[in-house]
Amino acid sequence: MSFRLNGVGLTHANGFAALKGITLLAEKGERIALIGPSGAGKTSLLSVLGTALEPTNGLAEVFDCDQNFWGPSAIKALRARIGTVHQSPPIPGRQRVVTAVLAGKLGQWPAWKSLASLVYPLDIPGARAALERVDLADKLFARCDELSGGQLQRVGIARVLYQQPELILADEPVSALDPALALATIRLLTADAEARGATLVASLHAVDLALGNFPRIVGVKAGRIAFDLPSERVTVPMLHELYASEGEQLPIQAHEPHFLSQVPANDAATRAKCC
């Protein structure tokens, strides 16, 4: 098991209930896409899974360690096994790209090696290899504030590829990329997770990226799970209901103009196709 959430709720300090009664289980090696409108709770859900936030109620378990035992040492050990891709990577602008990538293993290295690597990169070949996978090898020694938003996102992905964690949590990892590059990058992440037997949970705005690349889809709306289904059982009416607050148009990447024609039009079509 990678994680288990049982009736998890999360209320922020301002009183806003971001998550309400979330129950979710992921076995090792699953690839799950979180979809839903802005403000649905996807980022909060990923934050709980990454131990950045502790549930207000309910129970969260990550790698068989439940939140009652999330002390400093336990959290440090868990985070060494978790890789997070942020929508806006928290990378200092003056930091070199090579250092940002190597930071992926700071939690796995002894303290002396982590400190030394911040001064002088200790695994330049490893960082270069990770950057090559996202077509940024030429930026190895560039400063991070010289990069575009899309390039910074790819540096964040290279850091996770270098880290090789057991659980990857990706929060809108390709939001700043053009459609073709977004598709290639999502395929890179899913292929890496599949090859290593790692668990991947990614929140995505574009439903075609989610349905076309992830076997399991979790729809999140107003802090609750609206549905949790194999991708082939998600129907057009389900998607429209999920995104009703954002208008009639579903969020779809431009590289899949005929995407909706491949999605079951209703539940009956889904049952006929899947059962």
Swiss-Prot record:
InterPro entries: AAA+_ATPase (IPR003593), ABC_transporter-like_ATP-bd (IPR003439), ABC_transporter-like_CS (IPR017871), ABC_transpr_PhnC (IPR012693), MetN_ABC_transporter-like (IPR050086), P-loop_NTPase (IPR027417). Its main location: membrane. Gene3D superfamilies: P-loop containing nucleotide triphosphate hydrolases. Its EC number is 7.3.2.2. One of its GO terms (cellular component) is plasma membrane. ATP binds at residues 36-43. SMART domains: AAA. It comes from the Bacteria. It catalyses: phosphonate(out) + ATP + H2O = phosphonate(in) + ADP + phosphate + H(+). It is an enzyme of class 7 (translocase). It is a peripheral membrane protein. It is found in: Cell inner membrane. This is Phosphonates import ATP-binding protein PhnC.
